[in-house]
Curated annotation (Swiss-Prot):
Its EC number is 6.3.4.20. GO terms for biological process: queuosine biosynthetic process. It comes from Caulobacter vibrioides (strain NA1000 / CB15N) (Caulobacter crescentus). CDD domains: QueC-like. The lineage of its organism: Bacteria, Pseudomonadati, Pseudomonadota, Alphaproteobacteria, Caulobacterales. The keyword Ligase applies. Its cofactor is Zn(2+). GO terms for molecular function: ATP binding; ligase activity, forming carbon-nitrogen bonds; zinc ion binding. This is 7-cyano-7-deazaguanine synthase. Catalyzes the ATP-dependent conversion of 7-carboxy-7-deazaguanine (CDG) to 7-cyano-7-deazaguanine (preQ(0)). ATP binds at residues 13-23. The gene is queC. Zn(2+) binds at residues 201, 216, 219, 222. Belongs to the QueC family.
């Protein structure tokens, strides 16, 4: 399929590294790209602020993408966060639970996000739902697995009589390869934007800017982001091969 053959996409956009790369990926391929974010009672408001910063800087630094960047939607689903509590929505330690999952796992989060995104996409006339889910460097979250997303895609299409596609460009990439994809899509300018503006840290830390971005440097999200950056940097900062 040639670039930008399909017309519109809706990116599930948190303002983190992965969804920021997915936004750039979609902007390279679609004529119109809208974004959707979810207020589900996250402990740190910085996540919602980062979304706007990334969108603003993408439009400012990449004029070729600015004309394709469409409307942003923010959906209030805090009632879901109150039910599906985790270390991301409540003041809890980040640790492994008895189920073998990190306490940062929000049960059903991606399933809920995709349901809301599909309902929005239906209204907006969009078939492609783009998300940053990944099996390679993920934290064991079952709703990041491709088989989960395939089942969700089938359920949405059956239940809404549509032909949605859940696209996951990072699914089989390591974090180092995700940095390489950033370089491929937008050069060092996009890498710098993601370092400076995106937010990953579970602790909401924005005070210190490391080579790989803002963050506490000790939570699992920061450690994974730093590890990927260091591996990519030491390997020569190459763009991901197409």
């Amino acid at each position: 399929m040639s670039p930008r053959e399909r017309q519109a996409a809706l990116v599930l956009f948190s303002g983190g590294q992965d969804s920021s790369v997915c936004l750039a990926w979609a902007l390279e391929r679609y004529d119109r790209v809208e974004t959707v974010g979810f207020d589900y009672g996250q402990r740190h408001a910085i996540e919602m602020q980062a979304r706007q910063a990334v969108r603003r800087e993408v439009a400012a630094r990449f004029p070729q993408w600015a004309e394709r960047l469409g409307e942003d939607h923010v959906l209030d689903i805090r009632s879901f966060g109150a039910v599906a509590q985790s270390a991301l929505t409540a003041d809890r330690a980040i640790e492994m639970t008895e189920r073998g999952l990190p306490s940062t796992f929000v049960p059903g989060r991606n399933l809920v996000f995709l349901t809301y995104a599909a309902a929005l996409a239906d209204r907006r006339g969009i078939d492609a739902l783009v998300g940053g889910m990944c099996e390679t460097d993920f934290s064991g979250y079952p709703d990041c697995r491709r088989d989960t997303l395939d089942a969700m895609q089938a359920a949405l299409n059956l239940g809404m009589d549509r032909n949605f596609r859940i696209e996951t460009p990072l699914m089989w990439l390591t974090k180092a390869q995700t940095w390489g994809l950033s370089k491929q899509l937008g050069g060092e300018a996009l890498v710098s934007l993601i370092v400076e503006e995106s937010h990953t840290c579970y602790q909401g830390e924005r005070g210190q800017l490391h080579a790989w971005g803002h963050g506490c440097g000790t939570c699992p999200a920061c450690e994974l982001r730093e590890k990927g950056y260091v591996e990519w940097d030491m390997a020569g900062r190459e763009a991901l091969a197409q």
